[in-house]
Amino acid sequence: MTSNEHDQETVHTKVREGYGAIARQGGSCCGPAKSCCGGGAAEAVAAAVGYDEAELAALPDGANMGLSCGNPTAIAELRPGEVVLDLGSGGGFDVFIAGRHVGADGRVIGVDMTPDMLSKARKNIVVYREKTGLDNVEFRLGEIEHLPIADNSVDVIISNCVINLSPDKPQVWREMSRVLRPGGRVAVSDLALLQSLPPDITKMVEALVGCIAGAVMARETEQMAKEAGFEKIILTEKRGYIEALTEWKDPLFKKILENLPAGSKMSDFITSLYVSAKKPLA
């Protein structure tokens, strides 16, 4: 194993352990179950990033874990009959929402590298079927850098606050290009940097698991998408999410604020970012 491969596996291990604990304990990336993002506040997080009450009410209990930083299904323009892939599907939140959009003739596949999350999501399938009458979702174990998905087999890829966790983001974008059919679409919500974070923050394990330490500049995301062959790339900043977390006095964000330069705000450094792109037809 090379030094780079070792570093990547270390990141995967930390993220897998962190999200495994979240799945078992019912917390969120922001902290344990009693923190701002756990329990009832998960609905507040979802509302703040654009999910409507009807979507949330139709979800199986526990699928919404407060792990969102945007609403990728809102920009995905999902159509009946499409095959959708969710990168880092967690408890199945966006998979179940997308399933209602694509209907009985469509299919939604969630990929996650954390066995505890997969177990939680698969248990939720039963309730999803009862609520919707649909049998159109599945969950697979795998890393988003090495997707267990066939070439040219997916119409749309969605992802919600996950790509920042990857230690090899260019490879994630190459994998997205590989599995998408020609003309396929990407609709991603993630966190992005507005300026570089202080080293003390980028070294924090909880900041990595909390989707902060692994974030990159928006222009870097655009460049990775271009190099992977995507076109019609659109980046849209959504700063309200970071401001909302600051107002909710999230414990992780409070700790990060303590390590920022005096007088700085979290929203000076990081933003929620929507990314849409298309794979060329030829």
Describe every region a protein language model picked out.
Residues 84, 157-158:
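Hydrophobic beta-strand segment of the Class I
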Residues 213-229:
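Short alpha-helix
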Residues 79-146:
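Class I SAM-dependent methyltransferase SAM/SAH-binding core
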Residues 2, 226-282:
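C-terminal lobe and adjacent flexible extensions of AdoMet/dcAdoMet transferase-like proteins
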Residues 170-185:
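A short glycine-rich, Lys/Arg-flanked "PGG" loop and its adjoining helix->strand segment in the class I
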Residues 192-212:
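Short, glycine-/aromatic-enriched active-site segment of Class I SAM-dependent methyltransferases
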Residues 2-45:
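N-terminal auxiliary segments of SAM/dcSAM-dependent transferases
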Residues 39-83, 94-101:
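Conserved alpha-helix/loop element of class I SAM-dependent methyltransferases that forms part
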